[in-house]
């Protein structure tokens, strides 16, 4: 069986990607990164999802980006925006996060003898992050094939982004067919330690709208004080 490293945050998108990679016949090695995010619920969800979705192994790597700050996701002094998606790069963008995660995944893939890395970036229902675009993935793949022993020796490395051109509704439908239990996932930027979602941050809004558009019941676990209304 061909091995693949799958970046697994614990959220809806990455869980779907793990299910897709498994469905495609890969032996999946799930990789999560503790980068100084506000809560541990996402990583706890990743552990459970790796087990539920049949990953062969799961590693959590520590890289504390909160030392630098620069993002509302890792700096608790900055507020998480709750006014909906706005033009431009949002304050929740974490500088170089995907580049760092993909680099770590690349290192593990080389050790495993794997030529395949999966990541759940999306260019349709995304929040304006520059490292979620097709040209970014293409550029990283080019770099990977120049900068690694495997690439130089002729084993081509591929970065798979199967959600790139899917809407959130399409992602949810795809995951549903593959048996992903979305109640196990945590997408909220400011979830509590139990993984309960705020319902109003950009990530929650996109997720809620996705369930609505897919006409699928929203199984997200919200804070008791959140009154669910149409997201669209």
UniProtKB/Swiss-Prot annotation:
Family annotation (HAMAP family): QueC (MF_01633)
NCBIfam families: 7-cyano-7-deazaguanine synthase QueC (TIGR00364)
EC number: 6.3.4.20
Reaction catalyzed: 7-carboxy-7-deazaguanine + NH4(+) + ATP = 7-cyano-7-deazaguanine + ADP + phosphate + H2O + H(+)
GO biological process: queuosine biosynthetic process
UniProt function note: Catalyzes the ATP-dependent conversion of 7-carboxy-7-deazaguanine (CDG) to 7-cyano-7-deazaguanine (preQ(0)).
Protein name: 7-cyano-7-deazaguanine synthase
Keywords: ATP-binding, Ligase, Metal-binding, Nucleotide-binding, Queuosine biosynthesis, Zinc
Lineage: Bacteria, Pseudomonadati, Pseudomonadota, Betaproteobacteria, Nitrosomonadales
Top-level taxon: Bacteria
């Amino acid at each position: 069986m061909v091995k693949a490293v799958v970046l697994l945050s614990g959220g809806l998108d990455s869980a779907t990607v793990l299910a897709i990679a498994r469905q495609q016949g890969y032996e999946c090695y799930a990789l999560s990164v503790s980068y100084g995010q506000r809560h541990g619920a996402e990583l706890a969800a990743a552990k459970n999802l790796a087990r539920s979705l049949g990953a062969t192994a799961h590693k959590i790597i520590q890289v504390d980006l909160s030392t630098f700050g620069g993002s509302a996701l890792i700096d608790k002094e900055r507020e998480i925006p709750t006014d909906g998606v706005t033009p431009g790069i949002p304050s929740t963008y974490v500088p170089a996060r995907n580049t760092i995660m993909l680099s770590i995944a690349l290192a593990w893939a080389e050790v495993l003898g794997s030529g395949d890395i999966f990541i759940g970036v999306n260019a349709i229902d995304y929040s304006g992050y520059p490292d979620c675009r097709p040209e970014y993935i293409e550029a990283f793949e080019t770099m990977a094939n120049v900068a690694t022993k495997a690439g130089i020796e002729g084993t081509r490395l591929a970065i798979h982004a199967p959600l790139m051109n899917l809407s959130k509704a399409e992602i949810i439908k795809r995951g549903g067919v593959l048996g992903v239990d979305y109640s196990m996932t945590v997408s909220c930027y400011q979830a509590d330690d139990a993984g309960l979602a705020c319902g109003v941050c950009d990530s929650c809004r996109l997720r809620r709208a996705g369930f609505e558009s897919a006409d699928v019941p929203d199984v997200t676990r919200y804070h008791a004080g959140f009154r669910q209304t149409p997201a669209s």
